[in-house]
Amino acid sequence: MRLETTRNFLFASAAVLAFASPAFALDGADVLKKMNAAYHVQGAEITAKSVATNGDNVTLSGVVIGSGMDPAQQFPIGNVTLEGVEEDNGGYTIEKMSFENVNYAKEKVAITIDDLYMTGVVVPADATANTVDAMLFYDEAHTGPASVKIDGKEAFSIAESNATMTKSEDGGTLSFDLTAEGFKGDLSGVTDPKSKEAIDALQLKSLSGDLTVNGSWEVAPGTINVDEYSIDVENVGRLDMSFSISGYTMAFIKSMQDAVKAQEANPNKEQADQAFGLAMLGLMQQLTFNNAKISFDDAGITKRGIDYAAKEQGTTSQQLSQMIKGMAPMMIAQLNIPELQNAVSAAVNTYVDDPKNFTISAAPAKPVPFPMIMGAAMGAPNTIPSVLGVTVTANQ
């Protein structure tokens, strides 16, 4: 009796598992399909030689990412491991997506990237929906040391990079951050004598610095605020940029993607490029300029630049500085912008005498539609500074 009961229990358990397994089994092929759909909207494509599923983990083997069928645009990235994959209303969430170290070589160029991964990845159920939920998101994308070698010599490297994305609770705003720490550039391999002379004089043979980007995107009005886009190069200076535009909505993005697809699908390249240009011109009509700013904080490059230019012209640095200060008002006068002429001249004089920082800002009293800017550029270029509220300052 006990044996019969045990046997019935085992049969019942097996039946339950048999019926339950398909409902809970993870479909690795569908995960890849949904990921590919999200990338395809952006003009990219992912292929894998095989897909293996083990519990809530998926392994994609022989992965290649690229655009179209052109072999030149295909980039093999090896195996990709997806950990903690869960189905979510037709889409998927992935705790961590890990990539093999990149070791790519073609002709004279070799690229290596270590410690690549993404966390908090959200794969949309329907990448064609015209909502923010149709986009592929991640909490963090990370790379470790990366290097580019040309003819066996390292030309560029980065110690580490991190990119993060954060969605507000109501889904109305997306914030983003990007840092690339410890990048290095080696220009010692330049062979052209004149260029090599300039690089040596400007002390640019070896460059090192950091890149920082952060901002936000308000989805409904399509307002992109890039609060900081800075490149800080040691012994050269720090370039800071920021801007804000509106109109970059989901509808705008879809129209832009459709234009790109149409361009790629047209075999007549000249005709495709012309149609794409007209499409972009039309889309620009939907954008609005809010503000922008660009500034440079000097760390020695200005003086070295003046010294080198003076030597090339057979004069002294002091004489060249005076020439620059004298020429600035005349050059600005040719643009017929009297309200900006004095400000530019004063800023140039101040900066050349004591290079600290130089800033150009555009802050109109109210947002300016791009068509108005384009109209001013074609009809009355000298009115653009007043239309955009341009100011120029130095050492402030």
Predicted regions and their residues:
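Gram-negative bacterial Sec-dependent N-terminal signal peptides
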Residues: 1-25, 362
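Glycine-rich, small/hydroxylated-residue low-complexity segments
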Residues: 26-396
